Amino acid sequence: MACQICDDTGWKAVETNGVRRVVRCDCKREEHARRLFEDARIPPRYRNCNFDNFQVYPNEKLTNAAAKVRKFAERFPDVQRGFCLIGPHGVGKTHLAVATLRAALARGNQGLFYEVSDLLRVIRNTYNPVTKTAEMDVLQPLLTAQLLVLDDVGKEKTSEWVEETMTFIVNSRYNQRLVTIFTSNYEDTPDIDVLDSLRVRVGSRMYSRMHEMCDFIEYGGADYRLLPPNGGVDDLMALWKVAGEQKSKLPTRAKNQLRAQMKPAKELGWSGGKHGT
């Protein structure tokens, strides 16, 4: 059925202070927004994530994080830096990142979402001789999107290829002044003795670039994935308490062993990235 306003021409006449002019019809704006949303690769599980359905509770760091991210979303694209959400599993990092992306898409900005492990799998598939997709077919949208969300950074097992590929993407966006959002479960510390730190997981070059590009926002809290159906604030507070108790009981022996194993590499000058960098 044709649009009753523009008859599917995409344009409509408006009059302001006696002056008639032609502007884009709302139907075309809606169609454009739908197309942007479909091309953004947001996984079905997260497609309905927004700021209004992000459930907060008396957790100062979490509420501050949500407020900062929402302010960023309201200002985009008039921003200079992205952000990196750091925290344990299930505290809503992906929800907040997608809520920001959806807000940008709704205002006509081009955006893209990739879980890093999935992105690397897609790129690897282009090396298969029977695959018709070229590597740059995958990379080009990442290098040009107005807003890119890279979810779960550091999850992929570290290798020279992984580090080179991710550093190329991040560095290219940095040079083009394009905004990137990251999420990660790994601790933000410059200490290369901590093997499960973000710096060691992604390599020193990418870690340094991320800090140049982004504001780091770190918080903890309840695991939303454990929230029962129709659970509320009291349930979240209880889950948060349990999470805090479990964290306080974690043994330090394993961590000390890892530090001891890392010491020889540190003495040889390994920075956490490739050998010799």
Task: State what each model feature region is.
Residues 79-97:
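Walker A/P-loop nucleotide-binding motif
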